């Protein structure tokens, strides 16, 4: 490990790996550090991602695909269900990954492109000069080293500390973070080609439960609830235990993971002087689903592309790096974040009675292709009692 690079990346998840690969392919010197001793572990993710979205970055490999999903099923509080086949669901169906293998594949590609990778190495402080981020103090393998860089990319996940140390407000209100628990269950009866989403305030208040197939009679079974609902006796693990006891009483637990995901609006700015913030660290996980793999990869690649140009011009100021912030906000991803935040805010306010009414009307809807706006228009037709609320939601999405 040298003490000076073009780009220093904090975190080796999908966002960091895409940034490292993109920059290294252009000949820049890149160091990516990961605080954990192994890439891809521990997994804190339901591991689902849309096929078309993923193909934008990497071709499918059976080594890291656990299941190829053909449909998505939504189940209302009273058990009413609606299924969307792949041709109608679009990015709501895709692959269930093996993140341990997938993350390592991405980092391997970054290393092959020329990026240096250091595991068991954490950033413990930024190097700041008159408010300009000039690198980071790294600690690993019993030593502490100051590493300077023209640009630092913070890709250190939902628990990101680095951007905060640099003066960026990264706080998430407790009601805008989902606290989650998940079991990897085996010996259970499931549709191995479908993801299933369960709604209901008794199941997962202000969140949802999921069943994501991982292979033969095996699935990730988990849920997320609003942080403000996380109370003694009603923690995510408590809700999950009740859900599993009801739906998979004979399932055998292979693994248990817990974690959190932000469902807020993105950071007010994802750049500063010498600093760029990507993925969950930038609070750009999907506020409706909590999904973050694609968004991390997209933002990581875009950040590197902008950083490359700024380094070539010799200007890595906030004003120069702002092109990254501006571009992702007007992208399809940025627009989806805005739209899905509004939809999330609508659904978390609904009672089980209203959720059931919506679920019942889903079954009457026949759309050629899944579209959020078309779905809401159809729901308005079938739910006159919810006319005002749904029209307000539709109008906000059109604004």
Curated annotation (Swiss-Prot):
Residues bound to FAD: 15, 34, 45-46, 48, 99, 123, 280, 292-293
Q: Please share the entry's free-text remark on the cofactor.
A: Binds 1 FAD per subunit.
Pathway per its UniProt entry is: Membrane lipid metabolism; glycerophospholipid metabolism
User: Its GO CC terms?
Assistant: membrane
**What reaction gets catalysed by this protein?**
a 2,3-bis-O-phytanyl-sn-glycerol 1-phospholipid + 8 oxidized 2[4Fe-4S]-[ferredoxin] = a 2,3-bis-O-(geranylgeranyl)-sn-glycerol 1-phospholipid + 8 reduced 2[4Fe-4S]-[ferredoxin] + 16 H(+); 2,3-bis-O-(phytanyl)-sn-glycerol 1-phosphate + 8 oxidized 2[4Fe-4S]-[ferredoxin] = 2,3-bis-O-(geranylgeranyl)-sn-glycerol 1-phosphate + 8 reduced 2[4Fe-4S]-[ferredoxin] + 16 H(+); a 2,3-bis-O-phytanyl-sn-glycerol 1-phospholipid + 8 A = a 2,3-bis-O-(geranylgeranyl)-sn-glycerol 1-phospholipid + 8 AH2; CDP-2,3-bis-O-(geranylgeranyl)-sn-glycerol + 8 AH2 = CDP-2,3-bis-O-(phytanyl)-sn-glycerol + 8 A
What EC number(s) is this enzyme filed under? 1.3.7.11
What does the record list as GO biological process?
glycerophospholipid biosynthetic process; membrane lipid biosynthetic process
- Keyword field: FAD, Flavoprotein, Lipid biosynthesis, Lipid metabolism, Oxidoreductase, Phospholipid biosynthesis, Phospholipid metabolism
Any remaining note in the record? Reduction reaction proceeds via syn addition of hydrogen for double bonds.
Which HAMAP family does the UniProt entry name for this protein? DGGGPL_reductase
Assigned protein family: Belongs to the geranylgeranyl reductase family. DGGGPL reductase subfamily.
Name of the protein: Digeranylgeranylglycerophospholipid reductase
Task: Please give the organism.
Answer: Methanosphaerula palustris (strain ATCC BAA-1556 / DSM 19958 / E1-9c)
Q: What is the lineage of its organism?
A: Archaea, Methanobacteriati, Methanobacteriota, Stenosarchaea group, Methanomicrobia
């Amino acid at each position: 490990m040298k003490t000076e690079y073009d780009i220093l990346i904090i975190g080796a998840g999908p966002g960091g790996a895409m940034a490292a690969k993109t920059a290294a392919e252009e000949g820049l010197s890149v160091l990516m550090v990961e605080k954990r001793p192994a890439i891809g572990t521990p997994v804190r993710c339901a591991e689902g991602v849309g096929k078309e979205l993923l193909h934008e970055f990497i071709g499918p490999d059976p080594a890291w695909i656990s299941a190829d999903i053909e449909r998505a099923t939504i189940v209302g509080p009273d058990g009413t269900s609606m299924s969307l086949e792949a041709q109608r669901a679009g990015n709501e169906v895709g692959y269930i990954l093996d993140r341990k293998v997938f993350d390592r594949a991405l980092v391997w590609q970054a290393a092959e492109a020329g990026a240096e990778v250091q595991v068991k190495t954490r950033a413990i402080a930024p190097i700041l000069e008159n408010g300009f981020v000039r690198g980071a103090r790294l600690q690993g393998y019993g030593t502490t080293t100051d590493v300077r860089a023209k640009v630092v990319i913070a890709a250190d996940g939902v628990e990101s500390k680095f951007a905060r140390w640099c003066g960026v407000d990264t706080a998430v209100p407790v009601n805008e973070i989902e606290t989650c628990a998940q079991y990897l269950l085996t010996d259970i009866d499931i549709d191995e080609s479908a993801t299933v989403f369960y709604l209901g305030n008794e199941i997962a208040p202000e969140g949802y439960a999921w069943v994501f197939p991982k292979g033969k009679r095996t699935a990730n079974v988990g849920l997320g609830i609003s942080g403000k609902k996380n109370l003694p006796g009603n923690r995510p693990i408590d809700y999950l235990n009740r859900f599993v006891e009801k739906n998979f009483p004979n399932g055998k637990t292979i693994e248990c993971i817990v974690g959190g995901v932000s469902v807020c609006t993105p950071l007010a700015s994802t750049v500063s002087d010498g600093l760029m913030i990507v993925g969950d660290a930038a609070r750009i996980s999907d506020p409706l689903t909590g999904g973050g793999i694609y968004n991390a990869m997209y933002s990581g690649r875009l950040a590197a592309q902008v950083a490359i140009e700024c380094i070539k011009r010799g200007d890595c100021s906030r004003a120069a790096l702002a092109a990254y912030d501006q571009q992702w906000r007007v992208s399809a991803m940025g627009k989806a974040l805005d739209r899905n935040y509004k939809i999330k805010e609508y659904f978390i306010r609904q009672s089980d009675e209203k959720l059931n009414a919506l679920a019942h009307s889903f079954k009457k809807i026949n759309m050629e292709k899944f579209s959020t706006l078309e779905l809401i228009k159809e729901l308005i037709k079938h739910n006159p009692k919810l006319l005002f609320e749904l029209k307000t939601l539709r109008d906000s999405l059109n604004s």
